């Protein structure tokens, strides 16, 4: 019995995409610190609740996309594809996790719980269920799911939603398309075979590479908008990180290969973490 339970837990963790959740946690922590009002206790429920709810959303996503995951080499290993976690089981476990995570958020305040729940609802219903199989705008609009992590973290510390909080969320929103389009270009054939209309799967490689670069350029005003609240340290670190990101994007435009798109993708996740850490350093100093 213990072996079976252990196996199940491992399957759920795989479906929960811990790397994605950990990046959302970085966003939530940074947002919490930027809104810090002298109370560290609320960081615990927003981190635990947000992580559980985000993981639950990913598990539901695994149940929704079994057929598509089967034809994609990148996702063919998932427990839902192998039959180790059934569709209804994924819905049930994921749904419970989303509800539990939102309830834990209440230990901070109702606004935190609202944003945790909002993130789950946007990811599951708006992005995964409705937009992803229908339009290339899927990840553009779906980026608001990540924004909710910033808003939840900020709300947990301050019980408020203001311009600074909005900018943090919009930064994550604007970062999302370029990040996931780089991944989709790397696995373009997978997405095409699964009939998922990610932008790189429905346009030529050069157009996709330009779209990635343009998306990241459009992100810059949101990143620099935080200058209203932070000092020169944030500006210097953010500009340096952005220069590196755009350098990889230029390389990708010149040579739109799977290898170059993978390099852009692999840097874009640390990029967001770097910007968030820069914001924290700037705030503290």
Swiss-Prot record:
It comes from the Archaea. GO terms for cellular component: plasma membrane. It is found in: Cell membrane. One of its GO terms (molecular function) is protoheme IX farnesyltransferase activity. It catalyses: heme b + (2E,6E)-farnesyl diphosphate + H2O = Fe(II)-heme o + diphosphate. It is a multi-pass membrane protein. Its EC number is 2.5.1.141. Gene3D superfamilies: UbiA prenyltransferase. Pathway: Porphyrin-containing compound metabolism; heme O biosynthesis; heme O from protoheme: step 1/1. InterPro entries: Protohaem_IX_farnesylTrfase, UbiA_prenyltransferase, UbiA_sf. CDD domains: PT_UbiA_Cox10. Carbon 2 of the heme B porphyrin ring is defined according to the Fischer nomenclature. HAMAP family: CyoE_CtaB (MF_00154). NCBIfam families: cyoE_ctaB. This is Protoheme IX farnesyltransferase. The lineage of its organism: Archaea, Thermoproteota, Thermoprotei, Sulfolobales, Sulfolobaceae.
């Amino acid at each position: 019995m213990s072996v079976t339970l252990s196996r199940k837990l491992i399957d759920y963790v795989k479906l929960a995409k811990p790397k994605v959740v950990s990046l959302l946690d970085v966003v939530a922590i940074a947002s919490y610190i930027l809104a810090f009002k002298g109370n560290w206790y609320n960081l615990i429920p927003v981190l635990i609740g947000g992580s559980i709810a985000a993981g639950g959303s990913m598990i539901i996503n695994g149940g929704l996309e079994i057929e598509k995951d089967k034809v994609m080499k990148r996702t063919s290993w998932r427990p839902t594809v192998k039959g180790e976690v059934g569709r209804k089981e994924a819905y049930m476990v994921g749904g419970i996790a989303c509800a539990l995570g939102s309830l834990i958020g209440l230990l901070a305040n109702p606004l935190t719980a609202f944003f945790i729940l909002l993130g789950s609802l946007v990811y599951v219903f708006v992005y995964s269920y409705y937009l992803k199989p229908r339009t290339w705008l899927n990840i553009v609009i779906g980026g608001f799911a990540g924004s909710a992590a910033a808003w939840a973290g900020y709300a947990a510390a301050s019980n408020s939603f203001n311009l600074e909080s909005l900018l943090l969320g919009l930064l994550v929103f604007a970062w999302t398309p370029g990040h996931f389009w780089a991944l989709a270009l790397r696995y373009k054939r997978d997405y095409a075979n699964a009939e998922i209309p990610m932008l790189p799967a429905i346009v030529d490689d050069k157009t996709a590479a330009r779209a990635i670069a343009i998306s990241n350029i459009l992100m810059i005003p949101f990143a620099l908008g935080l200058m209203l609240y932070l000092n020169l340290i944030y500006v210097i670190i953010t500009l340096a990180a952005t220069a590196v990101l755009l350098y990889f994007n230029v390389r990708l435009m010149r040579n739109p290969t799977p290898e170059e798109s993978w390099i852009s993708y692999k840097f874009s996740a640390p990029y967001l973490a770097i910007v968030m850490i820069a914001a924290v350093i700037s705030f503290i100093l």
